[in-house]
Regions:
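Cell wall/extracellular polymer interaction/catalysis modules
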Residues: 1-38
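A mature extracytoplasmic/lumenal domain signature
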Residues: 6-8, 18-20, 44-46, 87, ...
Length: 155
């Protein structure tokens, strides 16, 4: 589930369906269907946005391929992880992970989160079973402070 906090106070709880897990090799490239755990930030928002699996190497006409216009899409990673409306997975939200990596929400919750969140807001994803969020995919906030300091220039 997605718990939304404002200044440390829980303001909304929303069931979600995240990445289904597993991998598939297409044309020599291994694609993963996990939602990486880690600390993301809201990057931008689009309403609507066209999501197309061929943009990351999964042909639209393949078994898991897709090209859909999606409403209330809040992007949290440069490789295309969003919190977004997907009413076709309402049956799974809160109990089964079925997505390619995004966090699916029902229409009311996606619209609310889209309106509530701002670029720069923290989104922490936990307990997905997948590999951790990488730095190149907006994982800067996942780096422990001591490690961050160790990589900085001397004062």
């Amino acid at each position: 589930q997605v718990n939304v906090y404002n200044n440390g106070v829980l303001v909304r709880t929303m069931p979600t369906s995240m990445g289904m897990g597993g991998t598939q090799t297409v044309a020599g490239q291994t694609l993963t269907f996990w939602t990486p755990p880690g600390v993301y930030t809201v990057m931008d928002k689009s309403n609507p946005v066209v999501m197309d699996s061929s943009t990351y190497g999964l042909p639209v006409n393949s078994h898991l391929g897709y090209r859909e216009t999606i409403n209330y899409a809040t992007r949290i990673s440069p490789d295309g992880i969003y919190l977004h409306q997907l009413d076709s997975t309402v049956w799974a939200q809160g109990n089964t992970n079925t997505s390619h990596g995004c966090l699916n929400l029902n229409g009311d919750n996606a619209k609310w989160f889209f309106g509530f969140s701002q670029p720069g807001d923290i989104v922490e994803v936990r307990n997905t079973g997948g590999p951790p969020l990488s730095l190149q995919n907006n994982g800067d906030w996942s780096v422990p402070w001591a490690q961050w300091q160790a990589g900085s220039a001397p004062a």
